[in-house]
Amino acid sequence: MSKETFQRNKPHINIGTIGHVDHGKTTLTAAITRALSGDGLASFRDYSSIDNTPEEKARGITINASHVEYETPNRHYAHVDCPGHADYVKNMITGAAQMDGAILVVSATDGAMPQTKEHILLARQVGVPYIVVFLNKVDMISQEDAELIDLVEMELSELLEEKGYKGCPIIRGSALKALEGDANYIEKVRELMQAVDDNIPTPEREIDKPFLMPIEDVFSISGRGTVVTGRIERGIVKVSDKVQLVGLGETKETIVTGVEMFRKELPEGRAGENVGLLLRGIGKNDVERGMVVCQPNSVKPHTKFKSAVYVLQKEEGGRHKPFFSGYRPQFFFRTTDVTGVVTLPEGTEMVMPGDNVELDVELIGTVALEEGMRFAIREGGRTIGAGTISKINA
């Protein structure tokens, strides 16, 4: 049986749920599919089918970003249910780097929690341009405590504005009640999706640039070969195009023999779309997450660069102490993280939390790098800085 062909008749948007652990991100994702399935715009996905990798089930906590698709009357959405647990912020970075906007889920009973703040900060660092807030679990607050919800809203608006997200719409509701079929709360989820439609603009995709896709995952399909998945950052890829695999080792050439999106075949993949590419003659061990697949010779692997970096303050979740030349944190680019050695500018003895500084970095492995590219710097499970590559040295 041949696969269905993907229909491209609406603008395609990538969004995701972010926020503190147990505030209801995955429940909301399921509730959105439930609310839209009533209009024939989504297939209902229950909580357990979204929260679906083995290590997640055991802890009841989402680890890998899970992709769900649905439509509103105006758009087609690919929705990433992003990790909420502190150990897995790494995946949040790679999941968030692909969002055109995010739904920040906050429990009305708790208000903003440490991870709420970290996720807003990370969203800003990795370039998520717009946020819509879903204030969840309002059904658990009694009438006499209703003004608490107003306080939580005010606090959230201030927090978002501080990080550069001004005037974010806030929708109140209960994901669980919507999931259980309560008509009033299903209406709230529709209201949320209307706010997403209205407040997260369709981005201009970089269709005309040379094709590039950071690889998120690699699968082996028996009898067909190796599939790499990810979100196309720019350009167009067609079946039978020659491409290169760049980064984390020697550059390899291959040919694209298939393009798929949500298990449907496509003649081509375009900038902004999450796709799987079937590659000819590439074994599962020849390719890994963190490489990019791109138009031949459009990007080169590098290890050394100059960068403009902002080092987070202690209050923003950053380091408490300065660092010196020879510091070795992890650098996160697109879907990869690599240890790098930092050299401070001449005459600078140390870098304090809160500083803006120019750093020379040498990575211990090659990565497909370009000038102007953004990255996060992490150490011991927390983000300590964010930067942009100003010049490639080698």
Swiss-Prot record:
Localization of this protein: Cytoplasm
Molecular function as annotated in GO: GTP binding; GTPase activity; translation elongation factor activity
InterPro entries according to UniProt: EF-Tu_GTP-bd (IPR041709), EF-Tu_GTPase (IPR050055), EFTu-like_2 (IPR004161), EFTU_2 (IPR033720), G_TR_CS (IPR031157), P-loop_NTPase (IPR027417), Small_GTP-bd (IPR005225), T_Tr_GTP-bd_dom (IPR000795)
Region G4, residue ranges: 136-139
Catalytic activity, reaction form: GTP + H2O = GDP + phosphate + H(+)
Entry EC no(s): 3.6.5.3
rRNA processing listed as a keyword: no
Binding site for Mg(2+): T26
Region (G2): 60-64
GO (cellular component) term, any one: cytosol
Main EC class the enzyme belongs to: hydrolase
Ranges where the record places region G1: 19-26
Residue span(s) of domain tr-type G: 10-204
PROSITE patterns: G_TR_1, G_TR_2
Region (G3): 81-84
Region described as G5: spans on this chain: 174-176
Binding site for GTP: 19-26, 81-85, 136-139
Keywords of this entry: Cytoplasm, Elongation factor, GTP-binding, Hydrolase, Magnesium, Metal-binding, Nucleotide-binding, Protein biosynthesis
Lineage top rank: taxon: Bacteria
Family: Belongs to the TRAFAC class translation factor GTPase superfamily. Classic translation factor GTPase family. EF-Tu/EF-1A subfamily.
PANTHER family in UniProt: ELONGATION FACTOR TU, MITOCHONDRIAL, ELONGATION FACTOR TU-RELATED
Function (record text): GTP hydrolase that promotes the GTP-dependent binding of aminoacyl-tRNA to the A-site of ribosomes during protein biosynthesis.
Subunit record text: Monomer.
NCBIfam families in UniProt: EF-Tu, PRK00049.1, PRK12735.1, PRK12736.1, small_GTP
Protein name, per record: Elongation factor Tu
Organism: Chlamydia pneumoniae
Origin organism lineage: Bacteria, Pseudomonadati, Chlamydiota, Chlamydiia, Chlamydiales
Gene: tuf
